[in-house]
């Protein structure tokens, strides 16, 4: 689970990202991001996930993918530049990704968008090839 200050939950924030967010695309994910409104400087960046039915009609598979993405993002949250809203949107082929590929895709998109405070951060967690249960 993402730390509470890093969760994007506001419907209007999701809509604002869809309408005016900058976009970075990878093979399995699209990242939408934009700075928070004025007066929100210094607030930790907030992250939202969208896993649509195009990925799988099975809610079990979509929820599993959502849990995996949250676990990948959790250790990265302290290293995100403050004051941004981020939205990761899945593509249909994301279900075929294995854990290391998924982790690399998220890290690549964050670097592409220049949203990491330092790029030498190990985004893999404690064990680089271990998959959480």
From Swiss-Prot:
Domain of life: Bacteria
Signal peptide segment: none
Catalytic activity as recorded in UniProt: Endonucleolytic cleavage of RNA, removing 5'-extranucleotides from tRNA precursor
InterPro entries recorded: Ribosomal_Su5_D2-typ_SF, Ribsml_uS5_D2-typ_fold_subgr, RNase_P, RNase_P_CS
GO molecular function annotations of the record: 3'-tRNA processing endoribonuclease activity; ribonuclease P activity; tRNA binding
Keywords annotated in UniProt: Endonuclease, Hydrolase, Nuclease, RNA-binding, tRNA processing
Pfam family, one: Ribonuclease_P
Enzyme class: hydrolase
GO biological process: one example: tRNA 5'-leader removal
PROSITE patterns assigned to the protein according to its UniProt record, in alphabetical order: RIBONUCLEASE_P (PS00648)
Entry EC no(s): 3.1.26.5
A GO CC annotation given for this chain: ribonuclease P complex
Cited function: RNaseP catalyzes the removal of the 5'-leader sequence from pre-tRNA to produce the mature 5'-terminus. It can also cleave other RNA substrates such as 4.5S RNA. The protein component plays an auxiliary but essential role in vivo by binding to the 5'-leader sequence and broadening the substrate specificity of the ribozyme.
Family: Belongs to the RnpA family.
Self-association and partners: Consists of a catalytic RNA component (M1 or rnpB) and a protein subunit.
NCBIfam families found in the cross-reference section: rnpA (TIGR00188)
Name assigned to this protein: Ribonuclease P protein component
Species, as recorded: Synechococcus sp. (strain JA-2-3B'a(2-13))
Record gene name: rnpA
